[in-house]
Every structure is written in C-alpha cells, then in structure tokens.
A protein has these predicted regions:
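Conserved glycine-rich Rossmann-like NAD(P)H-binding loop of the short-chain dehydrogenase/reductase
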Residues: 26-43
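Residue(s) in the substrate-gating loop at a strand-loop-helix junction
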Residues: 138
Length: 257
C-alpha cells in the first residue's frame, strides 16, 4: 500500500476508524472524513501515522463538501486510489409508524451520499488509470430486518447500485467492492438494536468487532473481490433467504420481542 491514498467517509469511530487504521498500518496515506472535524481529528490521532494522514470535515449529503475534500486530497496527495463509502445512519421503527422525513434523511446519507461520492471521485480515478470504490453495506441489504426495515432498504439499494456500477466501471479499471457485515459491536450497532418493544434482541446477536470488518475489507480490496460478507457464518443465512425465505423469516420472528 506504500504510496496509495485512501479516503474513508464516516471515519470518526467504529468501522470507518478501523478501516482507516488497517489501511494506514499497511502503508497507505489515509484521509479521514466526518461531519465533525474535531472527531475526525481525534480519530486520526488514534489511527496514528500522522505524517501521512489527514482529517477533514465532510457531510456526504452535500455535494459541494464532497467536491471540496476530493480537491483537497488531490492537492495534498496528488491521487485517490481507494474511496470507502462508510458514512451511515439508522432508525428503529416499523414501516407503518416511521416518519417519512426520517426515512428520507436515512436515504440521503446511506444511499444518495454514497452515490454522490462515487460520482465525485470517478473522474480522478479514470484520469489515474483506475482505482477502487468500497461500499460498506450490510447483511441487512440481503435479508430485511424487522423494525430496521428503512435501514435495510437503504442497504438493498446500495448493494444494487454498487454491483451495477462495478460492471459499468470495469472498463475504466475501477473495481467496486461491496462489504456486508452482520451485527457489529459498535456504538452505531448498539443504538440500532437497543432494547425496545419490537426490536431484535441484542442478546440474540453476539456481533463482530469493527476491526474484523476492517480486516475483511482490506482483504477484499487486495483480492479485488466483488463482495465480502462477514462473518462467513452469515453467508449461509443470505443464501438460505434467497432459496427459502419463509424459513429465515420464521427464525427471525422468534428473535423479535
């Protein structure tokens, strides 16, 4: 990774910070993005390698801010080899009761924000002769999760557009990798499944660490994979849902309060 430049959105904590650390540990220069500049800077110091890392404020819902950080990254490092779309938010509610504005805001960050970042960085990658775009999605983008259905919908959409973009950008030597983690032991994940009537019980999911997701992401990048599902034990669940959705729905129903 020496000489490579990696940009990570939503990098102030959790998966984003862990991904930034893994790539930096392998020799890459890393730009950490977060809506809160001070939190991005704090994460940068936790990541280390401060001589080749940069922290910038960026709200992925704002195309002007995305274009600004693309320009600054090119100014400081002359290139962008990898862009990681990790920024995301979640809401916990039933489809019948959710507020439409909250649902729209969810899509603005989780889906439209990722698409805007892709569109902003592709020209630089084309000019450089290639690159990699990594979308941090979710197993919930394969198997809808009750009372997290709006979140699942954003990840279904992200999975589809990432895999479609992969086909479209192959001729430009740009690989698009989709990473689908299961339940993760992060602040974000604990909020998503916090105890509440109608939510999936947190004790029913042990969860994996952000560091494990980051390592799987790096390996997927290194091998130019199309998709990574982590942990591997979720792969049979995804395949089973495709073949026998009723059986998976029965099992999920038993986990709902």
């Amino acid at each position: 990774m020496d000489g490579k430049v990696v940009v990570v959105t939503g990098a102030s904590m959790g998966i984003g910070e862990a991904i930034a650390m893994v790539f930096a540990d392998h020799g890459a220069s890393v730009v950490l993005l977060s809506r809160d500049a001070s939190r991005a800077e704090a994460a940068r110091h936790r990541v280390g390698h401060t001589e080749r890392t940069l922290a910038l404020a960026c709200d992925v819902r704002n195309r002007e801010e995305i274009d600004r950080v693309v320009g600054l990254t090119l100014h400081y490092f002359d290139r962008i080899d990898v862009w990681v779309n990790n920024a995301g938010v979640g809401i916990r509610d039933s489809v019948a009761d959710m507020e439409m504005q909250a649902c729209r805001e969810l899509f603005e960050t989780n889906f439209f924000g990722a698409v805007a970042c892709l569109q902003a960085v592709v020209p630089a990658m084309r000019q450089a002769g290639g690159g990699t775009i990594i979308n941090i999605s979710s197993v919930a983008g394969h198997v809808p999760v009750p009372f997290m259905t709006p979140y699942s919908a954003t990840k279904f959409a992200l999975n589809a557009i990432g895999k479609g973009a992969r086909l479209e950008l192959k001729r430009d030597n740009i690989n698009v990798l989709t990473v689908c983690p299961g339940y993760i032991q992060t602040e974000f994940g604990s909020h998503m499944v916090a105890a509440k009537r109608g939510n999936v019980r947190p004790q029913s999911m042990k969860g994996i660490t952000a560091e494990r997701v980051a390592r799987a992401t790096y390996e997927g990048y290194r091998k130019r994979k199309r998709e990574v599902i982590v942990p591997w034990t979720m792969i049979p669940v995804v395949k089973l849902y495709q073949l026998l959705p009723g059986l998976v729905e029965w099992g999920m129903g038993r986990a709902i309060k």
